[in-house]
């Protein structure tokens, strides 16, 4: 069957934390128009991205873009409140489908989000959050490099950093399984790819990477791999 839709993260893509360039975003819109594709932009990290990051929905005028936003990354992960922006006719169909498939979102949670957004402090909260994440990412990148890992990409913002293991080390899945025995949870590259071949990189969350045990484990594991 011919593809009908493309799902993507236009900014702070998971797992790399990178964003589309304006030129790449424009090419994707041209591609969607050429082949009649819907573009579902899962843009849940937008508030954590630089202000100049391209916005597919704005560039497209919601012609082929279905924009998905969320507050779970900036207010609370337990809120589970988001929103969709799209063409009016499609919005009516999506609302009907949502009512049939899952009824409504919690009204209490929606009212809480409305209060947070209208009380006047949300923008300052985002500024503090992005500043804390920037400092945490900087520390994480420096510590991973010191342990002997190499960054796959320089994140544009957000919380994720991906780093590769040196050559000659076990797969990231093997290391992650060993880490679990030490009480450390890692996200191996195998979680984020479709092929079955072993990966040798991890996705790290800067918001949860301040524990010194993580870096001691990485240093010890890599030393053991090089010695064998």
Label each region the model flagged:
Residues 1-49:
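Active-site phosphate-binding strand-loop segment of PLP-dependent enzymes
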